[in-house]
From Swiss-Prot:
Substrate binds at N230, M259, Y288, H324, S344, R345, G346, D385, G386, L387, R388, E424, Y451. Belongs to the ThiC family. Homodimer. One of its GO terms (cellular component) is cytosol. The keyword RNA-binding does not apply. It holds the Pfam family ThiC_Rad_SAM. Zn(2+) binds at H428, H492. [4Fe-4S] cluster binds at C572, C575, C580. One of its GO terms (biological process) is thiamine diphosphate biosynthetic process. Its EC number is 4.1.99.17. HAMAP family: ThiC. This is Phosphomethylpyrimidine synthase.
Length: 614
């Protein structure tokens, strides 16, 4: 180990306190499953007692979904250079259908492993990859179609329910009926239902056998709406330590998956550090790295280079690949009259390759070969929308929908191989055209999970596209999209920093939750009900803690009312002590109750007769 490596490790170990401190007002809990090694992480928010003025009852803790891994647990010691514990290794090994390799299969991976110039940035804890035994298929879809409930399936069933069965307060369980547009929303998520949805292709459980550190999570329209956060270095910004911290930051605020879109130096090494320290599924766009291998010349790409890249990343543990196999040669001319042409990086790379060679997209012609790789490691397809609209003027055009139809064709091929598959979607779409996107995707792709970037509903707000897109995300999530890819305020302007990542995730957690409420997902309204009760009872700390971002809520409150005494006050700085609508409402209730008591006493004093002569 040289001095440079020591410096990098020291830098990587110094995750900032803002990233690792416990989330205020809550603690990490683990809900047991049917076996000792199945412990499902959640977060329990402690609530204070209702003030005597409002009844003085106890308020039970509220359990919520948690994506932060061990990083917010003060009982856990984090060692980034060792990586997270291999939670799922035993589950993978006990199935007996994989084998540990003696070394890396990818020629590029082997070259990187033995290059002494990379000692300073290489992840220090070497682990040998696993692969399916000859003739075996190790995907969760393959197991599900054979009627097997894996530990991963039980894990996500427990996780989705969020201990709903433990709630005894009927007020918290109150919920408006949802409109699910034909989705099969369940009152209780069972392992059997998880298995059946994966077998049908309506849900995916992205868990590469070489990412045993991951905590299983499910993506499907009949489950909680998930969100993805993008990170990654570029030629002009960010390094390995910054990307690891950005990962931990993203999952702290609620990223269900993270895509590493690195295009700068040390892509391979950066990804290894990220995967080994990630409790959530990691996705990539392999064509980005393949392009780096040919010095950025799209026309120089070959199937052999791309295939080696897929194997390299699969053996590192990438859980899902964006593959732009639907960008066909015949669709490229359809983009010529668009306002913004082809805006997808992957789409433009493949379009340029097709035109340079005047051949069909090699990702399309080699799709079954790709399926063979995917099922050997259980990598999930995220079929890329390389021809998505880059402005609302281009929405729902022939190029976009032609590609979507091809993605439906490819989905059927992937399912023939029992490879889990989700479909990527737009993009920029005005509100009135959003449902058409969802309906066509369900129809063309057999209800495979839809994974959309927004969509952005207007193009006039650079710097605020986390808002323009969250509007569309909430709508399309309600209509049936299973996962929403976040957009940050920096969209179209630059690479996001930490605050941008936080703002983007918060916008999308709001959108996803709004979609779950509208669909009528079981228990979706519990947190809203708990927070509303706390708000009416002026339990300020509980309001902060029940919010999606407790730190910001407290920060905003304390800007004008910073004293501890203000946490007990029956007003906020918006209205002050004399004009608080909730305080006035409580006074009205008190007057009404006093009036009823007075009338009751008058009734009894009059002989308690229902009818009296005047």
């Amino acid at each position: 180990m040289n001095a440079q490596l020591s410096a990098l490790q020291q830098q990587a170990q110094q995750l900032s306190a803002s990233v690792t401190r416990p989330i205020p007002g809550s603690r990490k809990i683990h809900v047991p499953g049917s076996r000792p090694d199945l412990q499902v992480p959640m977060r329990e928010i402690a609530l204070t007692r209702t003030p005597t003025l409002f009844g003085g009852e106890e308020n039970a803790p509220v359990t919520v979904y948690d994506t932060s891994g061990p990083y917010t647990d003060p009982e856990v010691r984090i060692d980034l250079s060792a990586g997270l514990p291999a939670l799922r290794r035993g589950w993978v090994e006990e199935r007996g259908d994989t084998e540990q390799l003696e070394g890396l299969s990818s020629s590029f991976g082997r070259d990187r492993e033995h290059d002494p110039k990379l000692d300073a940035v290489r992840f220090p804890a070497r682990s040998l990859p696993r692969r399916a035994r000859a003739g075996a298929n190790v995907t969760q879809m393959h197991y599900a179609r054979r009627g097997i409930i894996t530990p991963e399936m039980e894990f996500v069933a427990i996780r989705e329910n969020q201990r709903l069965d433990a709630i005894r307060d009927a007020g918290l369980l109150q919920q408006h009926p949802g409109e699910a547009f034909g989705a099969s929303i369940q009152k209780v998520i069972t392992p059997e239902f998880v298995r059946d949805e994966i077998a049908r292709g309506r849900a995916v459980l992205p868990n590469n056998i070489n990412h045993p550190e991951s905590e299983p999570m499910i993506i499907g329209r009949n489950f909680l709406t998930k969100i993805n956060a993008n990170i990654g270095n570029s030629a002009v910004s960010s390094g390995i330590a910054e990307e690891v911290e950005k990962l931990v930051w993203a999952i702290r605020w609620g990223g269900d998956t993270v895509m590493d879109l690195s295009t700068g130096k040390h892509i391979h090494e950066t990804r290894e550090w990220i995967i080994r320290n990630s409790p959530v599924a990691i996705g990539t766009v392999p064509i980005y790295q393949a392009l780096e291998k040919v010095d950025g010349r799209a026309e120089a790409l070959t199937w052999e280079i791309f295939r080696d890249t897929l194997i390299e990343q699969a053996e590192q543990g990438v859980d899902y690949f964006t593959i732009h196999a639907g960008v066909l040669l015949r669709y490229v001319p359809l983009t010529a009259k668009r306002v913004t042409g082809i805006v997808s990086r992957g789409g433009s790379i493949m379009a340029k390759w097709c035109l340079a060679h005047h051949k069909e997209n090699f990702l399309y012609t080699h799709f079954e070969d790709i399926c063979e790789i995917m099922k050997a490691y259980d990598v999930t397809f995220s079929l890329g929308d390389g021809l998505r609209p880059g402005c609302i003027a281009d929405a729902n055009d022939a190029a976009q929908f032609g590609e979507l139809e091809t993605l439906g064709e490819l989905t059927k091929i992937a399912w023939k191989h029992d490879v889990q598959t989700m479909i990527e979607g737009p993009g920029h779409v005005p509100m009135q055209l959003i449902k058409e996107n969802m309906d066509k995707q369900l129809r063309e792709c057999g209800e495979a999970p839809f994974y959309t970037l927004g969509p952005l509903t207007t193009d006039i707000a650079p710097g605020y596209d986390h808002i323009t897109s969250a509007i569309g995300a909430a709508m399309i999530g309600w209509f049936g999209t299973a996962m929403l890819c976040y957009v940050t305020p920096k969209e179209h302007l630059g690479l996001p920093n930490r605050q941008d990542v936080r703002d983007g995730i918060m916008a999308y957690r709001i959108a996803a939750h709004a979609a779950d409420l509208a669909k009528g997902h079981p228990g979706a309204q519990v947190r809203d009900n708990a927070l509303s009760k706390a708000r009416f009872e002026f339990r300020w700390e509980d309001q902060f803690h029940l919010g999606l971002d407790p730190e910001k809520a407290k920060e905003f409150h304390d800007e004008t009312l910073p004293k501890d005494a203000h946490k007990l006050a029956h007003f906020c700085s918006m209205c002050g002590p004399h004009f608080c609508s909730m305080k006035i409402t409580q006074d009205v209730r008190d007057y009404a109750e006093a009036g009823m008591k007075e009338k009751s006493q008058e009734f009894r004093a009059g002989g308690a007769e229902v009818y009296r002569q005047g």
